[in-house]
Amino acid sequence: LLVLAGAGSGKTRVLVHRIAYLIEEKQVNPWNILAITFTNKAAGEMRDRVNQQVHFGADSVWVSTFHSTCVRILRRHIEFLGYETNFTIYDTDDQKTVMKQVYKIMDVDSKLYKERDVMAHISNAKDELITPEEYLKNAQGDIHEQTVAKIYQEYQRCLKKNNALDFDDLIMKTVQLFRTQPMVLDFYQERFRYIMIDEYQDTNKAQFELVHLLAGKYKNLCVVGDDDQSIYRFRGADIGNILNFEDSFSGAKVVKLEQNYRSTQNILDAANLVIRNNRGRKDKTLWTSNGKGPLIHFQRLDQAYEEAEFIIRDILSKGYPYQECVVLYRTNAQSRLLEEQCIQFNIPYRLVGGVNFYQRKEIKDILAYMKTISNGRDDLAVGRIINVPKRGIGATSIAKLTTFAAANNNSLYDAMHKAGEISGLGKAADKISRFIELIEDFRGRMKQKEYSLRQLIEDIVEESGYRAELENEGEEEAESRMENIGELINKATSYWNDTKNPTLEEFLEEVSLVADIDQLDQRENRVTLMTLHSAKGLEFENVYLSGMEEGLFPSYMAVMSGDL
């Protein structure tokens, strides 16, 4: 079943009621239902609504994102693929660090092969389920592509050595698992007899294949989407998945939801006018019973700073509650002038897509300790904290450890265990041994049931000397960083209290999968500044579209590439 759901047409309500209908009217075991959304925030909202709607068994319904679903499956079965189940999930910064190591190992010229471009090629390959070996085979006769393929191979080797996966691996490895382990696939086909997918227009080839495999046995598949809202092609989304749904799943039915409950007719008329000429779209016209509503206001200004000032002054003069206002723009670079105006007029604001909380140095440091405790093979985590805070293990000693590890096919942590065997370490060997003792002590404590993540973080901060080093940096700096660590402790405490069988690995997984938008609290009285891509699916009373000009909205690149 394909539900073509226009914007604001109540698609989440449809999915929630379908789940309730299956459980209460059709006596389907909730354990056999899988509902996939695209953000943790959407998954949480759907889970809450299912709980309100269904009178029993709602907790057994598996509601999560594609990535969370795959992580849960891989945590149980990834040993079939040669990994350990306590694998680490690498974020973008971690990927960049690994790529720098790969370039060094292979002596790659970063001017000829820009890291960012190569990482994009690898990500696209994984979205298309192309392995390094297949990439190399396809690259025959093209020296540039052959080099990219070899970089891809070495990158994957480094990840596996660290017992780590990147985001794109999560889905690709799950598909690989299902294709190579029929018994595992059969288990999940039996488990998930009723599958529902939200935002289907945003799926890529790997996600399509995952759904195809899971639904292959019982074919009880319901997807909800809107080809008019397909805005993630730059992330690998394939609009063909929704446009060709009836061809991919024979006998499929299509239902259209065209009544909009969110907007006024004037807004819908403008949207319909813009979208109606899209190539290959499925025909539908949104309508509403909300009335015509006010006309869309258009304001022409000469300079970007004038535009920013106009928007902020307008919010002030109209007296709008700040939390009901959002300013949307095409690129993150446009936020600077808007931020400056908010500061000048003393308007509280939140910037979605700014520095992610989990990317802050002190947070990454503490998480690196936790990752090392969880997965000693994670060389990135170990390398980050081996001398943080400073404990007298300098760059020369670390280089000797790294060389020894590579020569003996050891992880960095394993090499540290053998510090006494490595010549030239001198006094650093004792300091390395004390670091190992600290980590092993924490591992021992984590085996005690009563020892919580809150205690672990507090003990890491105190016993590693992290707090003391922060305080040496200055009172103001220490206070700010400790406040952030306090927020991490709050997050860990909430997870610990709200989870049935909490584990360190699952907490790290939850943190690694969190997106910027998941942390958005619309109840805070602040003006929201965000890109259009971040705003998808959100609602605000007052919306300002900035930078509606030639070459910017849509971008010059989109026009030239023919993607419009």
Give short role names for the model-derived ranges.
Residues 9-12, 201-280, 284-289, 403-406, ...:
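Conserved helicase motor core of SF1/SF2 NTP-dependent helicases
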Residues 138-141, 321, 335-347, 360, ...:
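Conserved helicase C-terminal RecA-like lobe
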Residues 1, 6-9, 19-194, 218-219, ...:
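A basic/glycine-biased coupling hinge at the interface between accessory DNA-binding modules
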